[in-house]
Design a protein with these regions (language model features):
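Helix-loop interface residues and adjacent transmembrane-helix termini in multi-pass membrane transporters
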Residues: 8-9, 84-85, 111-114, 118, ...
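Residue-level signature of transmembrane alpha-helical cores of multipass secondary-active transporters
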Residues: 26, 65, 91, 95, ...
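Membrane-interface helix-loop junctions in multi-pass transport and translocation proteins
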Residues: 89, 99-132
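Helix-terminus/linker motif at the lipid-water interface of multi-pass membrane proteins
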Residues: 45-52, 108-115, 176-181
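Short membrane-interface helical motifs at transmembrane helix boundaries
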Residues: 32-63
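Interhelical loop/hinge segments that connect adjacent transmembrane helices in multipass membrane
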Residues: 124, 135-176
Length: 181
């Protein structure tokens, strides 16, 4: 998203391809997580320290939410692009309402509808869809400078974009490690 803003400010014709490029690479990378979620959820839970009971309880949960990996990634991407395109209030609303959706629908799906852990997984899996939908408000507005210009995925451009995001990535990974530990 930062590279998009820099290129847009330089009036570069390449600026419009960054959003599409990010979405495509997120999908490509998410295929790994979908594969792990579908075929190795028990191994993943065990790797993260789950005992046999946790593996049994969390297997379906992990399988469901890992299949929604593209949506989690797209939500982060949409949020970053909207924020960097000058609309931090929409980005914050997307984060807030997707989190609230998760909390409320965890309860609704688990207890009144009796879906147990699968219901919790569905609530978690669908929450980024809410965030993306809210970000679409910005994309449809006249204020948006983001265009969905199809471009071929480029590994070189991916590395170029990732240079700026390394510090955020380290922060996210650190947060995850601290949570697990």
């Amino acid at each position: 998203a930062i590279r998009f803003v820099v290129e847009r400010n330089k009036k570069s014709p390449d600026a419009d391809g960054y959003f599409f490029h990010a979405l495509v690479w997120a999908f490509i990378i998410s295929l790994f997580f979908i594969f792990v979620g579908l075929f190795l959820p028990d191994k993943l839970i065990a790797l993260l320290g789950g005992d046999a009971q946790i593996v049994a309880t969390g297997k379906n949960y992990t399988r469901i939410f890992m299949c929604f990996a593209p949506f989690f990634m797209w939500n982060y991407i949409c949020n970053a692009f909207v924020r960097n395109d000058g609309n931090p209030s929409i980005a914050m609303s997307a984060t807030l309402f997707s989190s609230l959706f998760n909390i409320v629908f965890d309860y609704i799906l688990m207890f009144p509808l009796g879906l147990s852990m699968e219901g919790a997984a569905l609530a978690t899996a669908l929450s980024p869809v809410i965030g993306i939908a809210i970000c679409c408000i910005h994309f449809q507005s006249k204020k948006s400078t983001i265009r969905l210009k199809p471009v071929l995925p480029s590994f070189r451009r991916l590395l170029y974009c990732c240079q700026v995001g390394v510090s955020s990535f380290v922060g996210e990974i650190s947060s995850g490690v601290i949570t697990v530990v």
